[in-house]
Amino acid sequence: MKVGVVGASGYVGGETLRLLVNHPNVEITMVTSRQHVGEYLHRVQPSLKGFTDLTFSELDYDKLTDKCDLVFTAVPHGTATEIVKALYDRGIKIIDLSADYRLHDQDAYDKWYGWEHPHPDYLNKSVFGVPELHREEIKKAQLVSCPGCMAVTSMLALAPLIRNNIIDTDHIVVDSKIGSSGAGSGSGTAHAMRAGVIRPYKPAKHRHTGEIEQELSEIAGKKIHVSMSPHAVDVVRGILCTNHTFMQKDMEEKELWKLYRQTYGEEKFVRLIRDKKGLYKFPDPKFLVGSNFCDIGFDLDEDNNRLIALSASDNLMKGAAGSAIQNMNVMCGFDEMDGLRYTPLTPV
C-alpha cells in the first residue's frame, strides 16, 4: 500500500516514518514539509539515513491523490482542518495526528480550543482512533483521528471502571506527567530552564480533558466531567497518568484484576502490571520507550474508598505515531502488530 506523510519534519512525523520504513505492507511515496522542500528526508530526520532517499515535496493534493492510498497528517493543530477536508473529498483514507477532528461537537472546540471549527459537518465523519475502544468503527472509516497522548493513556485505565459502574463518575482526577517531546520539536525553553523540572502546565482546562470526557461519557451513556492536571518532567519520552477515582461498589483486588483481564486480555498493546517483586510493581514509562504498549495497574486505598488506576505509555508511540500505525493496520486489514513489533528500549 502506498502512503504519504504530510508534515514529516517534526517529532510525530519522524516517528511515524520510523515505523513506516519497517512496515512489511507499506511503501512511502510522498512526504511534505513547507520549510524543507527539496531537501533529503534524512537531513531533517537523521535516524532515517540509509532507509530512504525521499526528498520533501510541497503540499499538492493532486499529487497526493495520484501517489497515495492513505495519508497521515502530522501538522500543527488548526492546520489540518483544510488538508483533511481536501483529502477526504478526494476519497483518500486519512489518519490525522492533529487535534482538529478528535472532538465530535462544535461546542467542544469552542470550549477546549477557543476557536470555531471551519468544517463542523466533517466532525462526525471522523472516528476516534483508539482500536481498544472503537475497532469495528475504525475498520470501516475513511478518516481516523488519533487521540491525544495523555487522553489515550488515561482513558484506557478508566474505561473498564466506567463501563462496569465501579467508580463515582462525578469525582475523577487525572494527574499526568509527560516528557519534553510532548511539546513538539519547535524552539522552546532553554535547556537550563527545562532540565530537572517537575513543572505544572495548564493545571486546569487542559484540552486533552475534552477527549477524555467525550469518550468516557459515550461509554457511560451520560455526561462525565474529569479534572486533569498535567506536569512537564525531566524525561524526553513518556507519560504516567495517576487516575484518582472513588469506588461506588465494594470489590476486592482480585475482582478488579479479573475485570481488567476480561477487558484487555486479548489486546496486543495493553499490558497489565501487577508484580509483587522487582522494580516494575506499577506502570512506569521508563520501561515503555520506543514501544506501542500502554501499561495499566492500580492500587487500593481502602481507608478512603479510593481506587488509583495507573497507566503509562510512550507519548510518541501509543500517544501518537504508534497509534497511527495501529489504526492504519485496522483500517486496511493488516495484522494489528505489523510495523509495531518493538520491545521497549532499556536502559534509556
Swiss-Prot record:
Binding site for NADP(+): S9, G10, Y11, V12, N315
Pfam families given in the database record: Semialdhyde_dh, Semialdhyde_dhC_1
GO molecular function: N-acetyl-gamma-aminoadipyl-phosphate reductase activity; N-acetyl-gamma-glutamyl-phosphate reductase activity; NAD binding; NADP+ binding
Pathway: Amino-acid biosynthesis; L-lysine biosynthesis via AAA pathway; L-lysine from L-alpha-aminoadipate (Thermus route): step 3/5; Amino-acid biosynthesis; L-arginine biosynthesis
Entry EC number(s): 1.2.1.103, 1.2.1.106
The family this protein is said to belong to: Belongs to the NAGSA dehydrogenase family. Type 1 subfamily. LysY sub-subfamily.
CDD domains linked to this entry: AGPR_1_C_LysY (cd23939), AGPR_1_N (cd17895)
Methyltransferase found in the keyword field: no
Protein's name according to its UniProt entry: Putative [LysW]-L-2-aminoadipate/[LysW]-L-glutamate phosphate reductase
EC primary class: oxidoreductase
Keywords from the named record: Amino-acid biosynthesis, Arginine biosynthesis, Cytoplasm, Lysine biosynthesis, NADP, Oxidoreductase
